[in-house]
Amino acid sequence: VIATEARAKYNAQQRAGDHDIYKGLTFWAPNVNLFRDPRWGRGMETYGEDPYLTERMGVAVVKGLQGDDPKYFKTHACAKHYAVHSGPEWNRHEFDVTVTPRDLWQTYLPAFEALVKKGNVQEVMCAYNRYQGKPCCSSDKLLIDILRNSWGYENIILSDCGAINDFWQRDERTPRHETHPDAESASADAVLNGTDLECGNSYKALIKALKEGKISENDLDVSLRRLLKGRFELGMFDPDERVPYAQIPYNVVESPEHVAQALKMAHKSMVLLKNKNNTLPLSKTIRKIAVVGPNAADSTMLWANYNGFPTHTVTILEGIRNKVPDTEVIYELGCNHAADFVIQDLGNHITSPAGQGFASEFYNNTEFKGEAVYKGLASQLHYTTGGNTQFAPNVNLTNFTARFTGEFEAPETEQVEIKLSGNDAFRLFIGCLLYTSDAADDLI
């Protein structure tokens, strides 16, 4: 489903002449690192700490992304982050991994080997950290001895974003490896050890490295051939009529079949650990339910990270209200995501005729003209289009306006702080007072 929709979007964007970033056919997934440290904030991308489960899931994802056509790949999958990279995040740009050979071969490498040999993965991303003193993106042991020579991998290796900069840049705020004197030495070493493509800007120095004799044109041609081969096998240089995936129409994106499949996957991927007093499924006879927590009414938080952008997200709060429409459902933030103090959110004291929250009105123009195309109840005002996400049904992705109206009754007499930020112009009315902002990312 993901690869099909990716191809559909790519086809439409190519025909529109849109070649911008994030609109290609390379997916930097799956993440087959092992989630061994709960402090690692990106652990939700992985399949846990079991090497066998990670291998099986990873191979399935690769095959699904890359398709089964005998000549062309649907998209490119990418095994990351190679290797021995499982957090913590804060020192990844300087960390030198120490791991026993047994742990390396039995724990950290099996999933990568399986993706290469069983999944035929087309890209591998080398990690930020060092291994045995060398940055992973210039490690002859990891990239040449194991990946290319032992496993027979002949496809693209690319760096994690900014990883080559860690070789040579000096930064007091962010300690780095500092294993190389300059960008040209770092870039040449990375290419010579198999890193064909950089996410970053250090490879600009390859021209100088070539002139200084640190690398040859023949060395560069090795990587160039791999990169061009990858593009040819995606069908980028062939007429659309010869590439079966180029025929996928845009209307498959979020089609009823795909939405049903996504819902099925969500159902089957959940595990109910406890159901005290048979609380679930929720009974429609319950008179009052309190929903507490910062993620309950936050659609963007539910997307996680490095995610696609759905046209609509059902928050936990919305889902509960939809399940028990006749039950009084109150919401409380409860706590912050991360802070050394607690902010008491008074948003649950904002009401409108429709209930707790703001009455919302959306117009498909920039002047509030005509009738609203959507009217509803907004429990929270944390919105982002993300390029594809509608604020409400039937509302344009761009060039629309919205009005949110509510009445705030303070629970007690005290000083209240109201914060509002946005990346476009907005106006805030408090009673008869007007506060305006015309600047991007402004805060009042």
Mark where each language-model region is:
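Aromatic-lined ligand-binding clefts that engage carbohydrates, nucleic acids, or primary amines
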Residues: 408-410, 414-429
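Conserved small/polar residues in nucleotide/adenosyl-binding loops
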Residues: 435-440
